[in-house]
């Protein structure tokens, strides 16, 4: 099945059970072959490479020591699990990663019994593993639950909430802290290795339990002094006092690329009679692949690449991305206004704020994986008179919703939200899709919600946000590139809650929010060719809705189509609510809403995802045709008074 002669040992491994039959001395060769296969696969598909290369040895050791899938491995985030997938029966599909009908780039329960818990967002692993561990305890089972979490994910409060609650799970819960930035402490050579093996050994842990019992019988003052001495000694030796204060038995640091260190330590903690236990493993992203080791980002996420040179395939030239348009316009605004500051949650590159930071390092705040804090931090800055732009992916803004309501909207604070990756996101699939921000933002009193139809509109909206101080305001924009309109010239401050009529018709009206405008215009051309005169409006604002324009369109057309790149409850709901409140549908007006379907769409190319959702020209034409085929009453023809925008460049 696998003719690659460079991986003879890996070729024999179809399941972890077969891995566990190997002689321990063979594991180094297996790890080397697994690293080659991971690089080769990502060279074909693109994806997250550096993090997977950093856990090759750890992945081998975990499956060798623990009885997976009976013992549950719960990977945080999941983008480091390509090697795990190769070892768990999915090697034959590994070159379908992140493609239509292919393997997910993250863990997915429906994909394999070895994926104990699905993940793609950070800092969930300890909570989930605690659930598995408590289920094991309640079932009187000895099955282990192992959370593998990176040091970056430890910046999120959820990880500490779980650790604070973990003591009840006892020995069944093991947390592997994968420290790949050496941000906590580096291993300190032979002494560190010896101490890690020693303090994880059964005799040492038994002795410590005995001494704990002795201390508990001491007078209060002596007992307190003894505990402090124990903490001091362990802190000097290992640096783990903080985790011990949370109720964990700390082991480490351990060299995560040395199987001779890893395996004995993991065996010791597996067989421990007390817990929970945290094992601090130090790794290096991109380990074993020179181009990744040399790269600044350690090849965290890559395009398809030449595995020999490490050179990545370059995207064809085209219009700038929406993210870069946002970033460049924000830099221009900040040069004119020193009250503008920016906040991101561990995504400076993804949100374009790395560019902003080059110009204004003291005005860009990366708060780590802490979206709740990011939103309230922005609220505090706004309350103090600054102009914060809180820049988050749509899917991660979900984590800060209570703060949106309680700390921003209720107080009507002028926080600017830049909601990146809105709508469908292609290869990252359902976990990273920005499906819901429209629905949860338009429901908030005081909130202004905008969506640009092209890159110039985005620049106008950023300019408008910089000059809006009446309350919170947001702009949502998609992953990918613009449509190619000119960005030259002065940007305009848009009147709040005012859309623009792009094309005038008489029978069908398409109300478009966001970047579906291009498809709406294509559909209008086809409908006009069929004798169905079609108006097209770029609504710009989901909230406040342009009620005057909406009212005119609803009164003067037989079929109304709304289209948006969001789930049920967003822009269309605003239109339908207004139509219902004003009785505009009472005489037979047909309104059809095109939005994301009520299901989680799997990974695919973006435009294919939108076509599948019916959010393209074909979908619009089909919706109009279906609406007209139903019986309808005549509609009074009212002359439109809104002028067509003269400078429309699409």
Curated annotation (Swiss-Prot):
Its cofactor is Mg(2+); thiamine diphosphate. It comes from Zymomonas mobilis subsp. mobilis (strain ATCC 31821 / ZM4 / CP4). One of its GO terms (molecular function) is thiamine pyrophosphate binding. Coiled coil: none annotated. PANTHER family: 1-D-DEOXYXYLULOSE 5-PHOSPHATE SYNTHASE-RELATED, 1-DEOXY-D-XYLULOSE-5-PHOSPHATE SYNTHASE, CHLOROPLASTIC. One of its GO terms (biological process) is 1-deoxy-D-xylulose 5-phosphate biosynthetic process. Binds 1 Mg(2+) ion per subunit. It holds the Pfam family DXP_synthase_N. Disulfide bonds: none annotated. Thiamine diphosphate binds at residues 79, 120-122, 152-153, 180, 289, 371. Transmembrane segments: none annotated. It is an enzyme of class 2 (transferase). It catalyses: D-glyceraldehyde 3-phosphate + pyruvate + H(+) = 1-deoxy-D-xylulose 5-phosphate + CO2. Pathway: Metabolic intermediate biosynthesis; 1-deoxy-D-xylulose 5-phosphate biosynthesis; 1-deoxy-D-xylulose 5-phosphate from D-glyceraldehyde 3-phosphate and pyruvate: step 1/1. SMART domains: Transket_pyr (SM00861). This is 1-deoxy-D-xylulose-5-phosphate synthase 2. Belongs to the transketolase family. DXPS subfamily. Mg(2+) binds at residues 151, 180. Homodimer. CDD domains: TPP_DXS (cd02007), TPP_PYR_DXS_TK_like (cd07033). Catalyzes the acyloin condensation reaction between C atoms 2 and 3 of pyruvate and glyceraldehyde 3-phosphate to yield 1-deoxy-D-xylulose-5-phosphate (DXP). InterPro entries: Dxylulose-5-P_synthase, THDP-binding, Transketo_C/PFOR_II, Transketolase-like_Pyr-bd, Transketolase_C, Transketolase_CS. Keywords: Isoprene biosynthesis, Magnesium, Metal-binding, Thiamine biosynthesis, Thiamine pyrophosphate, Transferase. Its EC number is 2.2.1.7.
């Amino acid at each position: 099945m696998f003719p690659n002669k460079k991986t003879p040992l890996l070729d024999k491994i179809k399941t972890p059970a077969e891995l566990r039959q190997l002689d321990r001395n063979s594991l180094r060769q297996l790890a080397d072959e697994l690293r080659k296969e991971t690089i080769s696969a990502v060279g074909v598909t693109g994806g997250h490479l550096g993090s997977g290369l950093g856990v090759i040895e750890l992945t081998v050791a975990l499956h060798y020591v623990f009885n997976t899938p009976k013992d549950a491995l719960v990977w945080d985030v999941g983008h480091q699990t390509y090697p795990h997938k190769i070892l768990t029966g999915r090697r034959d599909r590994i070159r379908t990663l992140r493609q239509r009908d292919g393997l997910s780039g993250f863990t997915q329960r429906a994909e394999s019994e070895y994926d104990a818990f699905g993940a793609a967002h950070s800092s969930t692993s300890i909570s989930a593993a605690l659930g598995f561990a408590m289920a094991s305890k309640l079932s009187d089972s000895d099955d282990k639950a192992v959370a593998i979490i990176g040091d970056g994910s430890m910046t999120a409060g959820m990880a500490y909430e779980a650790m604070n609650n973990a003591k009840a799970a006892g020995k069944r819960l093991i947390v592997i802290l994968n420290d790949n930035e050496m941000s906590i402490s580096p291993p300190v050579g032979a002494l560190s290795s010896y101490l890690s093996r020693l303090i994880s050994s059964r005799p040492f842990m038994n002795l410590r339990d005995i001494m704990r019992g002795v201390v508990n019988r001491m007078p209060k003052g002596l007992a307190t002094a003894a505990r402090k001495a124990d903490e001091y000694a362990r802190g000097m030796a290992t640096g783990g006092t903080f985790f011990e204060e949370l109720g964990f038995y700390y082991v480490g640091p351990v060299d995560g690329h040395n199987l001779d260190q890893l395996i004995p330590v993991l065996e010791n903690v597996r067989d421990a009679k007390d817990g929970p236990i945290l094992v601090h493993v130090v790794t290096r992203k991109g380990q074993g692949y020179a181009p990744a080791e040399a790269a600044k980002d350690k090849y965290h996420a890559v395009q398809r690449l030449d595995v020999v040179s490490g050179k990545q395939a370059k995207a064809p030239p085209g219009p700038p991305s929406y993210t870069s348009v946002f970033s460049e316009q924000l830099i221009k605004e900040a040069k004119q206004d020193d009250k503008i500051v920016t906040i991101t949650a561990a995504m400076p590159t993804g949100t374009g704020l790395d560019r902003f930071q080059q110009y204004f390092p003291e005005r860009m705040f990366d708060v780590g994986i802490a979206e709740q804090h990011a939103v309230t931090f922005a609220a505090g800055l706004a309350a103090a008179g600054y102009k914060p732009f809180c820049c988050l992916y749509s899917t991660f803004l979900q984590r800060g919703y209570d703060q949106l309501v309680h700390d921003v909207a209720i107080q009507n604070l002028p926080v600017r939200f830049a909601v990146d990756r809105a709508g469908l996101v292609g290869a990252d699939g359902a976990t990273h899709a920005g499906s819901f921000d429209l629905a949860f933002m338009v429901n908030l009193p005081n909130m202004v919600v905008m969506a640009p139809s092209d890159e110039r509109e985005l620049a106008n909206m950023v300019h408008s946000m910089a000059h809006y101080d009446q309350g919170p305001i947001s702009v949502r924009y998609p992953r990918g590139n613009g449509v190619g309109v000119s960005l030259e010239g002065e940007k305009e401050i848009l009147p709040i809650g005012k859309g623009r009529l792009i094309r005038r018709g008489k029978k069908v009206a398409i109300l478009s929010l966001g970047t579906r405008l291009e498809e709406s215009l294509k559909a209008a051309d086809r409908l006009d060719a069929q004798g169905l005169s079609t108006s097209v409006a770029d609504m710009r604002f989901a909230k406040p809705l342009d009620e005057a324009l909406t009212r005119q369109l609803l009164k003067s057309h037989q079929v109304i189509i709304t289209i948006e790149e969001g789930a049920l409850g967003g822009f269309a709901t605003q239109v339908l609510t207004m139509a219902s409140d004003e009785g505009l549908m009472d005489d037979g007006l047909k309104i059809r809403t095109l939005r994301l379907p009520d299901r989680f769409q799997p990974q695919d190319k973006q435009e294919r995802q939108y076509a599948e959702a019916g959010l393209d020209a074909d979908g619009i034409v089909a919706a109009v045709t279906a609406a007209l085929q139903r019986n309808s009453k005549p509609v009074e023809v009212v002359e439109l008074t809104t002028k067509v925008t003269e400078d429309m460049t699409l």
